[in-house]
Amino acid sequence: MLDVKEITDSIFKLDKRIRYVAILNHQYGLVESRMREGVASLTPAQTDRDFMTLAAPLMVGSAEKLRPFCGAIRRLAVRYDKVLLVFYRTAAHLVVLSLEPHAEQALLDRIGDSVRKLELASGEGGAEKGE
């Protein structure tokens, strides 16, 4: 069974353009926050943590309000000049990645499929303890 750190390591192995991985539980509590080794963050660490715990619930929660009408969210992406942020909702977590800004659609699909498979392999396909 994979733990959160092993899932993060596996996500980094998917593509060298993945700069950062954050994993949040369904209450948007930050479980993991890690930059790729050797990659400099564009933002201070505290800003990253604040963004994940404040902005992620607002952005994803707002988008999920359309779920009954439009279906499940595959991913939510925000493209900045210098970085691409991608949010993937899984059964047990919200996985947030930052990538190099010109990542193509096919790569985002492949990463999303892999993130979901990794989580299933971890045995965390259901709700977390305490949720």
Feature map (PLM): residue ranges:
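Non-catalytic interaction/Regulatory regions outside core domains
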Residues: 1-131
